[in-house]
Regions:
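A structural motif detector for short, solvent-exposed N-terminal "entry" segments of globular domains
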Residues: 13-27, 38, 105-163, 202-204, ...
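Solvent-exposed beta-edge/loop recognition patches
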Residues: 11, 74, 86-89, 170-316
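A short glycine/threonine-centered beta-strand motif
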Residues: 41-54, 136-147, 213
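Residue-level recognition of beta-strand termini and adjacent short loop/turns
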Residues: 41, 75-77
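Short, surface-exposed alpha-helix to beta-strand junction/turn motifs within ectodomains of secreted
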Residues: 45-71, 153-155
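Sec-dependent bacterial lipoprotein signal peptides
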Residues: 1-11
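Surface-exposed loop/edge segments in extracytoplasmic proteins
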Residues: 64-72, 162-168, 218-222
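Conserved structural position at the C-terminal beta-strand
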Residues: 97-99
């Protein structure tokens, strides 16, 4: 599921630019820059900027008419918004707003704020296949360590800042010990107890990053790097083969969700022997160290999506 998000700027550029000053007046002529936005409660959200701002609730609207902003309190570089109705978990509330800095430069923007999930489950990526077939498609399994509601939980083929696919899960209660399967392809086959459709486009076959967040562009929960390459595989992209995979590896390194650092292709889980029926899964009982050693490739036909992981490893 892909949702558009865009920013409309007034009196400033969409990309960071050099600060401009009126030499005679000594005034700053660059508008504020929006740095981030997220829900902070069932009826509240926060927008962050690169400088002190002012904001009037009358300058903020919800275009779809389903909600309204009751107040907008600016404190230094942040604006706290209060809504008349709840921000529904797993749903996107669009707002249009205008803020000004201390000398009157303005920024107009439109963003989508995802509803606040007060009861997210504790999850980890548990198993995946990247070389799927029509009968055994690409899949990712999430293991529920502590129960909660899946609303807004987001799985990326990539990282939130660079991805090929984004799967935003709906409101759905899960319990500790559940296995949640995200399946890619034309349609769901209906063979797993808890499953969701990830889209028609599957995962990168040999090299990539799979990551899990508490909301679209939210806080990262877990991630895994997989590769069949080494640092010497190429000189241009650090061995990762393509610019986008290298970029995602850099983002993963910055997140702190994979080790060792610096991240190189050979520090990922070796995907060489993964097939449609030989999945890559966490080794049962192994500690979660955010390293390749936490994972193994299972024997042919032993993929265990929706069930306990296979302990045996494939040996060529």
């Amino acid at each position: 599921l892909l949702f558009p998000l865009f920013i409309l700027l007034s009196n400033c550029e969409a990309q960071p630019q050099r600060e401009l000053f009126n030499v005679l007046a000594g005034k700053d002529h660059q508008g504020p820059v929006l740095l981030g936005w997220h829900a902070t409660g069932t009826h509240s959200a926060r927008c962050s900027f690169d400088e002190f701002v002012r904001c009037d609730a009358g300058k903020i609207v919800c275009p779809d008419g389903t909600n309204a902003v009751l107040s907008a309190v600016a404190f230094e570089r942040e604006v706290e918004l209060t809504f008349s109705r709840p921000l529904v978990p797993g749903k996107r509330q669009e707002i249009r707003a205008r803020v000004t800095d201390m000398v009157g430069n303005s920024l107009s923007f439109t963003v989508g704020i995802w509803g606040y999930n007060a009861n997210p489950p504790e999850l980890r990526i548990n198993e995946f296949v990247t070389k799927g077939s029509s009968t055994n498609p690409d899949r990712v399994e999430l293991y529920v360590k502590q129960g909660g509601n899946l609303a807004g939980i987001t799985l990326y083929d990539g990282m939130s800042g660079s991805f090929d696919s984004e799967c935003i899960l709906p409101a759905f209660a899960v319990s500790a010990g559940d296995h949640v399967v995200i399946e890619y392809g034309e349609r769901l086959r209906g063979i797993h107890p808890i499953e969701f459709w990830g889209g028609e486009v599957g995962l990168g076959a040999n090299n990539g990053v799979i990551s899990l967040y508490d909301a679209p562009e939210g806080r990262i929960i877990d991630a895994v790097l997989y590769s069949n390459r080494t640092s010497s595989s190429d000189e241009q992209y650090g061995g990762f083969g393509t610019k986008k995979v290298q970029q995602r590896a850099v983002l993963l390194q910055e997140s702190g969700e994979w080790k060792p650092i610096p991240i190189v292709p050979e520090s990922g889980v070796d995907s060489t022997y993964c097939t449609a029926t030989r999945s890559i899964c966490r080794t049962p009982g192994a500690a979660d160290t955010d390293r390749a050693a936490d994972w193994h490739v299972v024997p042919t036909g032993k993929a265990s999506f929706g069930n306990e992981n296979e302990k045996e490893s494939y040996h060529p």
